[in-house]
């Protein structure tokens, strides 16, 4: 061994248990798996674990929609997720669930320690409540305009545009995602984690070099704006763990989700009958290394809350966070309508796992850059690199060795200096794998592949094979080519596990990092079989079409506008009779200064004037065109005080929003003030 063996615990972010794994998820799991496989090749003791994130309101509501229990739903989803990851050869040592006894015990332990140490605060807060569904709304079930950057359609806990976090009550014009209703405020006692108490520790950790520069810079912005206490409780109804000694209060999903890393590892230790490793890895002075691979959208939780929770409860902090960017397809956000929102299982019906593993790896670096899966470039790169450069190197030499020399390689290297060039590259390539500069590693390997193919081209074994008395030269040349191929595949083994197994079967030896210093001399290889097939754009077309069909099938029970806006609960005739709908004449329509959504309408009800603010500006950029039109309004709606004045009713419109809003009009002959029945 050239280095001291390390104890390493590696995690990926926990997939949420209410949906299928897609190619966006796979970037992270492939990145982590490549790194883990490299560490194992170098002799390190690696535990690679993950779990499903199985709690929260979304899971509770989806299970209700499906007519099953949350436990049944997350159980089925866990099996699907594990099947997908296995299909991509993600080499987890354990895959668990946050809905487990290990996670419950650890969540309660950490909470209790934080409380005993004075880091849990209780206070009554005003919280958004859905009056139609009779439930408090979790952060992710409220949408509105970000209070910081003013981006629309943002969730209630953090902005996906500027990265800011905030309270749902700070959202501008909030709406319930569950019912579409405007939430009302209600008081509730909540429990808060005192994050500001850890500001000094977190800043020191940030400056320690444990984080990527981009992450550290972002954290500095958060420190400068001031850390806030973190709400860690949610009110019933909620699917999760009830807080000890607090009936009707549950741990917020983001409290027990990262603890799921610990829960999954403890479950693994229990399976092994190993009662000491959990403490060895998680105790405060542990010499083990702990790495979290995560996406840039959850940096805030992992870089602030998680290390602070661990510090406050007497556990060790992560050695590092490895953060990656998002996945785009063909230069754009993944789209269901375009067929580029591709599930992992769909991919495996059309391509092998190694192809995507290679393409992602070739594009990854240690930076937090987005990765574009350009499907045409994908086909070209896989064919050019894996097929033409690497596999072809074996095929053009193996035939001669099998047919002319019974599979036995030469006893000496034809070009020891060239072989040394290949083995000397192990230092640079190994450092690239270690530092997650995956793209650099691939470039170095492909440069060697080009060198190997030039050697074969120059030696021309197909010519030598036809010349009398040159059998020894032919064996030496082809053996050299196969030995160079072996070194290349050893370097690529973390990326291409399926191809590597086939290569090991052909070479009749394991691809080992430490073994490349010794070439295969006088060694017998097995009969050569096709190692990898070319791919083409027809497969891409079929993949995209299949993804489109899956979307259609999922939407089949309900089509059209009903798919996005289902019919609400049945009401009685008496309920409907309370709503007074009237025909109104639009006398005037104008922009509202200070608002990019509202128009101010002056309506004539046949003897009574009404002032109404309506959010239809995006569909009617010329308000003057509305003057003189008849429409329908809710005439007995209580006046609503707004920033721009008092709105005395509501006009009726259809459509999903944006430019697709259509003001309703009565048939010809209807007069202002007439009731709509």
UniProtKB/Swiss-Prot annotation:
InterPro entries given for it? aa-tRNA-synth_I_CS, Anticodon_Met, Met-tRNA-synth_bsu_C, Met-tRNA_ligase_1, Met-tRNA_synth, Methionyl/Leucyl_tRNA_Synth, MetRS_core, MetRS_Zn
The places in or outside the cell where this protein is found are: Cytoplasm
Matches recorded under Pfam families: Anticodon_3, tRNA-synt_1g, tRNA_bind
Where is this protein chiefly located?
A: cytoplasm
Question: Coordinates of motif 'KMSKS' region in the sequence?
Answer: 333-337
Q: Write out the entry's keywords from A to Z.
A: Aminoacyl-tRNA synthetase, ATP-binding, Cytoplasm, Ligase, Metal-binding, Nucleotide-binding, Protein biosynthesis, RNA-binding, tRNA-binding, Zinc
Q: Which residues bind ATP?
A: 336
Cofactor: binding comment: Binds 1 zinc ion per subunit.
The reply on keyword Cytoplasm is yes
Q: Which GO terms describe its cellular component?
A: cytosol
Q: Which Gene3D superfamilies match?
A: HUPs, Isoleucyl-tRNA Synthetase, Domain 1, Methionyl-tRNA synthetase, Zn-domain, Nucleic acid-binding proteins
Q: What is its EC number?
A: 6.1.1.10
SUPFAM superfamilies from the UniProt entry: Anticodon-binding domain of a subclass of class I aminoacyl-tRNA synthetases, Methionyl-tRNA synthetase (MetRS), Zn-domain, Nucleic acid-binding proteins, Nucleotidylyl transferase
**What range(s) does the tRNA-binding domain occupy?**
575-677
This protein's record includes keyword Flavoprotein: no
Task: Provide the cofactor list for this protein.
Answer: Zn(2+)
Q: Where is the motif 'HIGH' region annotated in this sequence?
A: 15-25
Subunit annotation? Homodimer.
Q: Which family does it belong to?
A: Belongs to the class-I aminoacyl-tRNA synthetase family. MetG type 1 subfamily.
Q: What is the role of the protein in this entry?
A: Is required not only for elongation of protein synthesis but also for the initiation of all mRNA translation through initiator tRNA(fMet) aminoacylation.
The name under which this protein is listed is Methionine--tRNA ligase
Q: Which organism is it from?
A: Citrobacter koseri (strain ATCC BAA-895 / CDC 4225-83 / SGSC4696)
């Amino acid at each position: 061994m050239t280095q001291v063996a390390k104890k390493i615990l590696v995690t990926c972010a926990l997939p949420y248990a209410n949906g299928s794994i897609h190619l966006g998820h796979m970037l992270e799991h492939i990145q982590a798996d490549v790194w883990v496989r490299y560490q194992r090749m170098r002799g390190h003791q690696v535990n690679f674990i993950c779990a499903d994130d199985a709690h929260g309101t979304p899971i509770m509501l989806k299970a209700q929609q499906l007519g099953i229990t949350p436990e049944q739903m997350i159980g089925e989803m866990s099996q699907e997720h594990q099947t997908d990851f296995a299909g991509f050869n993600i080499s987890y040592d354990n895959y668990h669930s946050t809905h487990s006894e290990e996670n419950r015990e650890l969540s309660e332990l950490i909470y209790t320690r934080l409380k005993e140490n004075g880091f849990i605060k209780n206070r009554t807060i005003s919280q958004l409540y859905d009056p139609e569904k009779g439930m408090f709304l979790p952060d992710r079930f409220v949408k509105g305009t970000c209070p910081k950057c003013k981006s629309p359609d943002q969730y209630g806990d953090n902005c996906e545009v500027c990265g800011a976090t905030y309270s749902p009550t700070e959202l501008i014009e909030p709406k319930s995602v569950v019912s579409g209703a405007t939430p009302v405020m209600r008081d509730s006692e909540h429990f808060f984690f005192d994050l500001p108490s850890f500001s000094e520790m977190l800043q020191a950790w940030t400056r320690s070099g444990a984080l990527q520069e981009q992450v550290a810079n972002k954290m500095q912005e958060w420190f400068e704006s001031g850390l806030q206490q973190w709400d860690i409780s949610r009110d019933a109804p909620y699917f999760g763990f009830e807080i000890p000694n607090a009936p009707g209060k549950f741990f917020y999903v983001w409290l027990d989700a990262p603890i799921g890393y610990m829960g999954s590892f403890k479950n693994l230790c229990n399976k092994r009958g190993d009662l000491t490793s959990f403490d060895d890895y998680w105790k405060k002075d542990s010499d083990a290394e702990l790495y979290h691979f995560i996406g840039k959208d959850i940096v805030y939780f992992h870089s602030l809350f998680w290390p602070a929770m661990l510090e406050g409860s007497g556990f060790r902090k992560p050695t590092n966070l490895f953060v990656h960017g998002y996945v785009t397809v063909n230069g754009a956000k993944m789209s269901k309508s375009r067929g580029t929102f591709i599930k992992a299982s769909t991919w495996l019906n059309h391509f092998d796992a190694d192809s995507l593993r290679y393409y992602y790896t070739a594009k990854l670096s240690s930076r937090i850059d987005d990765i574009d899966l350009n499907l045409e470039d994908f086909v070209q790169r896989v064919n050019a690199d894996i097929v033409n450069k690497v596999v072809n190197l074996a095929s053009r030499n193996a035939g001669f060795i099998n047919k002319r020399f019974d599979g036995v390689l030469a006893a000496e290297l034809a070009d020891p200096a060239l072989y040394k060039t290949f083995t000397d590259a192990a230092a640079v390539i190994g450092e690239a794998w270690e530092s997650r500069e995956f793209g650099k590693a691939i470039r170095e390997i492909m440069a060697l592949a080009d060198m190997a193919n030039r050697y074969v081209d120059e030696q021309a074994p197909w010519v030598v094979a036809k010349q009398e008395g040159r059998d020894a030269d032919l064996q030496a040349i082809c053996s050299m080519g196969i030995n160079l191929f072996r070194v290349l595949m050893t370097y690529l083994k973390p990326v291409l596990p399926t191809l590597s197994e086939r290569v090991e079967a052909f070479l009749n030896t394991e691809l080992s990092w430490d073994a490349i210093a010794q070439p295969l001399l006088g060694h017998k290889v097995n009969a050569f079989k096709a190692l990898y097939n070319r791919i083409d754009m027809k497969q891409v077309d079929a993949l995209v079409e299949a993804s489109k069909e899956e979307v259609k099938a999922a939407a089949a029970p309900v089509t059209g506008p009903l798919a996005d806006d289902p019919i609400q609960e049945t009401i009685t005739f008496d309920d409907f009779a309370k709503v007074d709908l009237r025909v109104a004449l639009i006398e005037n329509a104008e922009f509202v200064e200070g608002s990019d959504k509202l128009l101010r309408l002056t309506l004539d009800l046949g003897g009574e004037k009404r002032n109404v603010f309506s959010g239809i500006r995006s569909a009617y950029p010329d308000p003057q065109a509305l003057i003189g039109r008849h429409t329908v309004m809710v005439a007995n709606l209580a006046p609503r005080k707004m920033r721009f004045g008092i709105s005395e009713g509501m006009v009726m419109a259809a459509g999903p929003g944006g430019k697709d809003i259509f003001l309703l009009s009565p048939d010809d002959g209807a007069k202002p003030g007439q009731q709509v029945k």
